[in-house]
Design a protein with these regions (language model features):
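Glycine-rich phosphate/diphosphate-binding loops that line cofactor/substrate pockets in enzymes
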Residues: 116-128
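Linker/hinge segments immediately adjacent to helix-turn-helix/homeobox DNA-binding domains
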Residues: 1-12
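Key DNA-contact positions within bacterial/archaeal DNA-binding proteins
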Residues: 54
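Short amphipathic alpha-helical elements of helix-turn-helix/winged-helix folds
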Residues: 29-33
Length: 264
């Protein structure tokens, strides 16, 4: 189950912008009139949104796109889909089928999550002076939940709703930064990395990548990968990420409690 790049970028733009801002106005119009704007020119879109041509160009740059041509290409190739969890016409059966899949997804996390790796991540959380937790849409929800839990445990961490702001932070982070990325499908870097904007160097942050995609490997941008088994479907998506985030927080709480115990 993969979300297209356009919905990700537009929803991230809406979540991070004032409802009355020009960028929100443009993003809302595109999402509400997707078929209508598929073949629109930049002049047509500006007219329909009651904004200037320069506002459309700035909107594209704010989303990390090169220009309007790239935006129009994304609009043309976007096909919104929703995965239905049950084939039954009965509401009670629909509920049961959906929740059964949710329970199965949590069981997969229980069986597959490597607690030794969780322990290494927890040590990094305790050790690094700067912590950031990022994700996209439902991944960012898991990031915010982990941020909140860490704060309750006395560890401040940073996050950003806007995807482009996450990328900017990754560009500027250094060896004092620990960055935790939640990416259910494992394609976080595919959304805005065609030109590999982050230059690899010796003073890069340590990046933990949490995903249900076992094809993701360590790279010049990813130091550690924390896997969980996943069927990569809609019912699993938010709950598996949330479960992993909660287990990280619980493990960190136990780690802190262990540090406070007097030596025998």
């Amino acid at each position: 189950m993969y979300y297209g790049k356009l919905p990700i970028l537009l929803l991230a733009q809406l979540s991070a912008s004032s409802p009355n801002s020009t960028n929100s106005q443009i993003a809302s119009y595109i999402l509400n009139h997707l078929e209508e704007v598929r073949n629109s020119s930049i002049r047509d879109l500006a007219s329909k949104c009651y904004v200037s041509l320069s506002s459309i160009s700035r909107f594209c740059r704010d989303m990390g796109l090169n220009d309007f041509a790239e935006l129009r290409e994304l609009i043309t190739e976007t096909d919104l889909k929703f995965e239905i969890a049950s084939e039954s016409d009965d509401p009670e059966t629909q509920k049961k089928d959906y929740l059964t899949k949710v329970r199965e997804s949590l069981f997969l996390v229980e069986k597959s999550l490597d607690m030794k790796k969780i322990g290494k991540l927890v040590e990094d959380i305790d050790r690094y002076p700067k912590i950031s937790v990022f994700g996209i849409l439902k991944g960012e929800t898991a990031a915010i939940n982990l941020q909140t839990s860490l704060l309750m445990l006395g560890k401040y961490s940073h996050t950003q709703l806007h995807f482009s702001k996450q990328i900017e932070y990754l560009e500027q982070a250094d060896e004092d930064d620990l960055i935790i990325l939640f990416s259910y499908t494992g394609i976080y870097f595919d959304y805005e990395y065609p030109n590999r904007r982050i230059p690899p160097n010796v003073k890069r942050p340590k990046v933990w990548f949490i995903t249900g995609n076992t094809q993701v490997k360590k790279s010049e941008y990813i130091n550690e990968v924390l896997y969980f088994s996943s069927r990569q479907n809609q019912p699993s998506h938010p709950y598996q990420l949330q479960a992993v985030g909660d287990i990280i927080a619980q493990s960190y709480a136990h780690y802190l409690a262990g540090k406070q115990k007097p030596d025998d």
